A protein has these predicted regions:
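Short, surface-exposed linear patches
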Residues: 27-29, 54-56, 63-65, 238-241
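Long, compositionally biased intrinsically disordered terminal regions
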Residues: 84-241
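A broadly used, surface-exposed interaction patch
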Residues: 51-90
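N-terminal ordered "arm"
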Residues: 1-58
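Charged/polar, solvent-exposed surface patches and flexible loops
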Residues: 17, 21, 82, 137
Length: 241
């Protein structure tokens, strides 16, 4: 079994925390792993958010000791979590699984440019809080006979599909970033989290990026990628690999 050597105990703890949050939303969650050199990218799709979450993890040595050897595999998030040894800063790569459809269609690796208009972190947090409050208020006001799954889903889609400020970023992407603790005050550290942003990601600041039909909310702790609302099947701009 292949063993990944993570940069340190903190990196291992942060990876475990990310996997735990994905599993909170889907106990059968899968993740796609891509490693090149000393950088590991972990892709996941938190259930119900309709976004991709990307977590960069630093390795202490290249995959299999060869900087030219790459890792690309989809595995069980639960099995990967069980293999993380925080004290040893290692993680064993589980057996490959038949990946869900999203795992075969990833955002582009390059061509990203900065998009204007993204509000600061505090305003993004307030936007999510207001959306959650509105959802609760509107659903609680429904008469019992109208409180169906279809109606709850309709209200949810209406609220979470709204755009953030003057951008094309849907509120659900910000909600996902906050739920996965990608979006948080730098000084706030919870169980399994470090105050240190992952150096391998190169993501020093909060930013909104675009590449083709994709948008990416970049934070110091990870990224959320989502297709633009108007993107159709006839204009796919993705990395299928």
């Amino acid at each position: 079994m292949t063993v990944l050597h993570l940069a340190d105990e903190t990196e291992a703890a942060d990876l475990a925390a990310f996997l735990s949050r994905l599993l909170h939303y889907d106990r059968s969650a899968a993740v796609r792993l891509q490693a090149t050199g000393t950088a590991l990218a972990v892709f996941g799709r938190p259930a119900s958010f309709e976004v991709l979450a990307v977590r960069a993890v630093r390795l202490s040595e290249p995959y299999r000791g060869d900087p030219d050897t790459t890792l690309d595999v989809t595995v069980s998030a639960g099995e990967l979590l069980e293999s993380v040894d925080e004290s040893a800063a290692t993680a064993a790569v589980p057996a490959a699984v038949t990946g869900p459809p999203w795992a075969g269609v990833l955002p582009p690796r390059g061509g990203w440019r900065t998009e204007p208009g993204l509000p600061p972190a505090g305003a993004l947090g307030a936007t999510v809080a207001a959306a959650v409050a509105e959802f609760r208020s509107r659903t609680q006001e429904l008469a019992q006979e109208h409180r169906t799954r279809a109606e709850l889903d309709r209200i949810g889609r209406e609220i979470w599909s709204r755009l953030v400020g003057e951008t094309q970023l849907p509120v659900r992407a910000v909600h996902a970033a906050q739920s996965l603790r990608f979006l948080r005050p730098p000084a706030v550290v919870g169980e399994g989290d470090s105050a240190r942003p992952p150096a391998a990601s190169g993501e020093e600041d909060l930013a909104l990026l675009s590449s083709g039909t994709w948008l990416r909310l970049r934070t110091p702790y990870g990224s959320i990628a989502v297709r633009r609302a108007e993107a159709g099947l006839g204009s796919l701009d993705v990395s299928v690999r």
